[in-house]
Amino acid sequence: METTTVKEISILKNGHVTSPSGFYAGGVHCGLRRKKLDLGWIYSDTPASAAGVYTQNTFQAAPLLITKHTIEHSKQIQSIIVNSANANSFTGKQGYEDALLMQKLVANQLNIEQHHVAVASTGVIGERLPMDKVRNGIRQLSHTQVDAESFEKAILTTDTSTKHVAVQVEIDGKLVTIGGAAKGSGMIHPNMATMLSFITTDANVNQDSLQQALRKVTDQSYNQITVDGDSSTNDMVLVLANGRAENNELNESHPEWSVFMDAWNIVAIELAKMIARDGEGATKLIEVIVKGASTNQQASQIAKAVISSNLVKTAIYGNDANWGRIIGAIGYSGVPVEASKLSIAIGGIQVVNNGEPIDFDEKDCKQALNQETVNIVIDLQSGMDTATAWGCDLTYDYIRINASYRT
């Protein structure tokens, strides 16, 4: 398989959740959507150590509650079932029973334990799942199918593209693979998990270490993106590690733990950037880099304030280097900043230096902003810490898409 190497970590061309050994996936159309695939699954040929992080939204959806309880008690997952078009959220007691039935049906279909099945849903909130359709879809599940592309399509809602990546790295002389898939286009905001993302790896990883590591990875990737400032009731990130690579068990004291974490971070950050780039109606990926901060938390706080600003996002859409909007966002971020030390560059063009405005050519700046990726670099010159956040521009199409979401 053709690869691109970054240090000792290889990024696979066209990598998927099925790239790690022992993982299978597929997707079918069961009738939740008019024509598109709407029910997907991941299966491991052996129970995998599992970890999850979940939305902080008060109204957590039934599938999320069941998955969270399952992982907390069993510590292992062998299959994940995901439906799109219907969130099964705010659907009362019956919605919970429907999600529980999905878990049971998958376990029966794949001949595995019910407490080894995770359930996820995404789509319209407040509508009951048509369980007859879901039941018929689950009957098509197979534990021998390797069709990650169908899985990636089945979990989408307003996304315009699938999101997937995989990397390989050698640990203990064994080739370890980490794959990932995600969905997310709207209702994306830094808040614990922020969308649906599924990570698979054939690494042998201690479950407690896996859970702690997932929180750290999430903070550096998914929690650093925003599209529209809304956080869904269903958002979660799940990771499965089935140990098929047969490396020595990984934990924080393993000599190559940092190598594993670096590889995992690449997967998570790439997926996060794909989500931000595919924001509803978006035409550009915006990357905000804050450096020279006293702490990483302060750098992250400022980066997220700027990337979440609708005024900044609309200015970028209009190719307008209105750096005053960036100043405004920094000012309300809650982080104390010395104005006399502040420097800002937009698209590589310096607009503020040591607290003073810099004359710049508007045409050059418009050209720099008229790119698929726009970088904003903010230098606080107050320390050594840095953070990066990702988002997208805000366009007329965002309103069009969300004004007719249910039609």
Swiss-Prot record:
GO biological process, one term: L-arginine biosynthetic process
Species the sequence originates in: Oceanobacillus iheyensis (strain DSM 14371 / CIP 107618 / JCM 11309 / KCTC 3954 / HTE831)
Active site: 194 (nucleophile)
Feature type site, description Cleavage: 193-194
Summary of subunit composition and partner proteins: Heterotetramer of two alpha and two beta chains.
GO molecular function: glutamate N-acetyltransferase activity; L-glutamate N-acetyltransferase activity
Keywords: Acyltransferase, Amino-acid biosynthesis, Arginine biosynthesis, Autocatalytic cleavage, Cytoplasm, Multifunctional enzyme, Transferase
Site residues by UniProt (Involved in the stabilization of negative charge on the oxyanion by the formation of the oxyanion hole): 122-123
Gene behind this protein: argJ
Catalysed reactions listed for this entry: N(2)-acetyl-L-ornithine + L-glutamate = N-acetyl-L-glutamate + L-ornithine; L-glutamate + acetyl-CoA = N-acetyl-L-glutamate + CoA + H(+)
InterPro entries assigned: Arg_biosynth_ArgJ (IPR002813), ArgJ-like_dom_sf (IPR016117), ArgJ_beta_C (IPR042195)
Binding sites annotated in the UniProt record for substrate: 157, 183, 194, 280, 402, 407
Matches recorded under SUPFAM superfamilies: DmpA/ArgJ-like (SSF56266)
Superkingdom: Bacteria
Taxonomic classification: Bacteria, Bacillati, Bacillota, Bacilli, Bacillales
Subcellular location: Cytoplasm
Alphabetical list of HAMAP family matching this protein: ArgJ
Name of the protein in its database record: Arginine biosynthesis bifunctional protein ArgJ
GO cellular component, one term: cytoplasm
EC number: 2.3.1.35, 2.3.1.1
Family from the record: Belongs to the ArgJ family.
Keyword Cytoplasm on entry: yes
One Pfam family in the UniProt entry: ArgJ
Function: Catalyzes two activities which are involved in the cyclic version of arginine biosynthesis: the synthesis of N-acetylglutamate from glutamate and acetyl-CoA as the acetyl donor, and of ornithine by transacetylation between N(2)-acetylornithine and glutamate.
